[in-house]
Regions:
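Residues at the C-termini of beta-strands that transition into short coil/loop
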Residues: 24, 99-101, 128-130
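Cysteine-nucleophile active-site neighborhood
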Residues: 44-117, 121
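Catalytic metal-binding/acid-base residues of hydrolase active sites
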Residues: 22, 77-79, 101, 134, ...
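A short acidic, often aromatic-flanked loop/helix-cap motif at beta-alpha or helix-coil junctions
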Residues: 26-31, 103-104, 134
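Amide-donor transfer/coupling interface in amidating biosynthetic enzymes
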Residues: 104-199
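N-terminal beta1-alpha1 cap of cysteine-dependent amidohydrolase-like domains
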Residues: 1-66, 176-199
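Structural motif
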Residues: 36-40, 72, 167-169
Length: 199
């Protein structure tokens, strides 16, 4: 909720009219009416339920992403963006919106984390707590890890950026702690909708 509140407040301060739409499993989702999609996390079981629902509209979601739709996906939502998430119980197919994958490994990566991201001038800060290790291949990371573990505890990078999609393990909440990232999302949404953004 903190990420949503931050987006709404920073729009309000600039006189940008915005509304929040919360979707339940039974709801129809029309991506043509959405400017920013927030995909949060949950337990593995909850993720599986949500993923099954989103798989039904995967083609529409993929079209939204490829048309520069803005998405911020945190923790479990980040894992869902990819091709699959392998746990000790089996393999959960992802939404295949970004060419990444996640595998559960022994031990959790828990700590404060600091990144340097190409998207914003200031360092990005947050808190990470994840058992999954995400591998992003040749994709652009959200940032280089200055302190903490990041995607897999080895690569030195955290998160992924694809077009106007950010996937990340950073809690905090992310956007209130990093208003520049919040403004980046708003600016991309305005550019997509109106062709320009003056923040």
């Amino acid at each position: 909720r903190g990420n949503i509140a931050c987006l709404m407040q920073r729009c309000k301060w600039r006189g940008i009219e915005a509304e929040t739409i919360e979707f339940e499993l039974k709801d129809e989702i029309d991506f043509a009416k959405l400017d920013i999609v927030l995909l949060g996390g949950g337990s593995d079981r909850e993720q599986m339920i949500v993923c099954q629902k989103l798989k039904e509209i995967q083609k529409d979601f993929k079209a939204y992403v490829e048309d520069n739709g803005v998405v911020i996906a945190v923790c479990g939502g980040y894992q869902l963006l990819g091709n699959y998430y392998k746990t000790e119980d089996g393999v959960m197919e992802g939404l295949e919106l970004v060419d990444i994958y996640t595998e559960q490994e022994e031990g959790r990566l828990i700590d404060n984390i600091v990144l340097q991201s190409e998207l914003v001038a200031m360092p990005v800060v947050g808190f990470e707590n994840h058992g999954g290790r995400t591998y992003i291949g040749e994709n652009q990371p959200f940032g280089k890890v200055l302190y903490g573990s990041g995607n897999d505890g080895k690569s030195g990078y955290e998160g992924v950026v694809y077009k106007n999609v950010i996937g990340t393990y950073l809690h905090g909440p992310l956007l209130p702690k990093n208003p520049q990232v919040c403004d980046w999302l708003i600016a991309r949404a305005l550019e997509r909708k109106y062709g320009e953004a003056d923040l």
